[in-house]
């Protein structure tokens, strides 16, 4: 039995998902697989999602099964991030960009790390922009 993504709180329509809004639970019927949680961060829901509701692919804008496979998405700034700011989840989103930056699977690892320069809205985070990122 694989876990699915379940709403950990009421998520209003058009809200960009953050890690604290989601949890992994084994539910029937299955929804979006729990291992997709890092890729869902920054994606918007297209309807209000009540607490405890299983997230289905059609509830998340631009979510298609398969397009969130690892390595496709990069971490992108969700806002202007001033120099020396410690990163938080709300500052980052996952997007398919070219050239590729830090993989979206790394978002949780980036939390608390500082940027060594100003990062603009929609700018791709590159490894050399984050202090002590390896």
From Swiss-Prot:
Coiled-coil regions listed: none
Alphabetized Gene3D superfamilies for the sequence: Antifreeze-like/N-acetylneuraminic acid synthase C-terminal domain (3.90.1210.10)
Gene Ontology CC terms, in alphabetical order: extracellular region
Tissue specificity field: Detected in blood serum (at protein level).
Predominant location: secreted
Compartments, as annotated in UniProt: Secreted
Domain of life: Eukaryota
The keyword Coiled coil is assigned to this record: no
Chain segments annotated as transmembrane: none
Domain AFP-like: from-to ranges: 4-63, 74-133
Record site: Important for ice-binding: 9, 14, 18, 44, 79, 84, 88, 114
Keyword annotations from UniProtKB, A to Z: Antifreeze protein, Repeat, Secreted
Pfam families linked to this entry: SAF
Family per similarity comment: Belongs to the type-III AFP family.
General function of this protein: Contributes to protect fish blood from freezing at subzero sea water temperatures. Lowers the blood freezing point. Binds to nascent ice crystals and prevents further growth.
Protein name, UniProt field: Ice-structuring protein RD3
Source organism of this protein record: Lycodichthys dearborni (Antarctic eelpout)
């Amino acid at each position: 039995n694989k876990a699915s993504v379940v709403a950990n709180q009421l998520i209003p329509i058009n809200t960009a998902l953050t890690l604290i809004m989601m949890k992994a639970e084994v539910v029937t019927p299955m929804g979006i697989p729990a291992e997709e949680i890092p890729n869902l961060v920054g994606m918007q829901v297209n309807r209000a999602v009540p607490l405890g509701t299983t997230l289905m692919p059609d509830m998340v804008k631009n979510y298609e099964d398969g397009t969130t496979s690892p390595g496709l998405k990069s971490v992108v700034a969700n806002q202007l991030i001033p120099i020396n700011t410690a990163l938080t989840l709300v500052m980052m989103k996952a997007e398919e960009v070219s050239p590729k930056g830090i993989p979206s699977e790394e978002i949780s690892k980036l939390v608390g790390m500082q940027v060594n320069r100003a990062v603009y809205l929609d700018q791709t985070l590159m490894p050399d922009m984050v202090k002590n990122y390896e």
